[in-house]
């Protein structure tokens, strides 16, 4: 099966590439080229981007910052990534709009659900920045929320690994990859795919998740076409 409307979740770490911090312009351009091909084929695409390559709220709070304050700083980091991604996409010929959950009128549109859907219908990519606008919620939860709001067929979680494993494959070469899982299995086994709030939202709204390696060129296209890559999580597995 192929998908007509997709929510792509990009972690901030994915934008780092092999760098220890910040944004790798080559990675941004590679992602932009893949997105361009998908959009040209008629798929509607929205993106939620994280901010962990610049600042992570949980780390800030563990270092003594007030948790809500740290989360707001993390939200600003996601906006920086969103604007950078917009620049890369538009240089690749993809008409793009950034919408933020916290109003920043000089640099982005405020998040308005109906406007976001209208942009998608016109063939524009919509990049959501600022998380969901509230502290204590991750960008994974934002992905599940926005996917439900825009009636996305699926969430693509683009990561540094080629799927979901029972252990970290970088530390444990013998780690076993899951081809498919149910939401209930992810919750009961506490498998680290997304936080439990995000998984529960996807479960309740019947939005499948496909986890795959973003650094493999063409993987976004393959996932949109319904090819079997990475790991799939759904109500039925």
Curated annotation (Swiss-Prot):
Any one GO biological process: 'de novo' CTP biosynthetic process
Membrane-crossing residue ranges in chain numbering: none
One Pfam family it belongs to: AA_kinase
Kinase listed as a keyword: yes
InterPro entries registered for this protein in UniProt: AceGlu_kinase-like_sf (IPR036393), Asp/Glu/Uridylate_kinase (IPR001048), Uridylate_kinase (IPR011817), Uridylate_kinase_bac (IPR015963)
Pathway: Pyrimidine metabolism; CTP biosynthesis via de novo pathway; UDP from UMP (UMPK route): step 1/1
Binding residues for UMP: 51, 71, 132-139
Entry keyword annotation includes Signal: no
Class of enzymatic activity (EC top level): transferase
GO cellular component: cytoplasm
Subcellular compartments: Cytoplasm
UniProt similarity note: Belongs to the UMP kinase family.
Subunit organization: Homohexamer.
Free-text function comment from the UniProt entry: Catalyzes the reversible phosphorylation of UMP to UDP.
PANTHER family the UniProt entry points to: URIDYLATE KINASE, URIDYLATE KINASE PUMPKIN, CHLOROPLASTIC
Name of the featured protein: Uridylate kinase
Gene of this entry: pyrH
